[in-house]
Amino acid sequence: MHTTLTHYARCVFGDEYRTTPPCDRQHDEALFIEQLTFADADAILAMLRELCPTLVDGYLPVRIRNLSYRLVLLQKPNEPALMREAAASLYAQGPDWDDIAAELERRADALDAAA
């Protein structure tokens, strides 16, 4: 059984650092995305940090990482450190999202300046 979002992600996508435990549940990406969509920010961050500890590693697909950070920032919109972490992840995946990453950094800087 998938006891956490991290465990579910590990079953669906694998884990670069740990063996994927045996599991008799269905491993459909669409069902995982449904769970991810309604997960709380802390569960999503725990998954990202355990499965991709240095942002550029791990087996989570880029589309799942991007969606995960987007969902976290929707739940925690005023946290500059999370904005910068999301920006770093976007920069690490190539130039396609550099403009979005730069905007996240600008927003983080503005929040810091206002504090």
Regions found by a protein language model. Give the residues of each.
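Charged, low-complexity interaction regions
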Residues: 17-22, 54-60, 73-76, 80, ...
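Structural detector for internal amphipathic alpha-helices that build alpha-solenoid repeat scaffolds
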Residues: 27-38, 61-75, 98-109
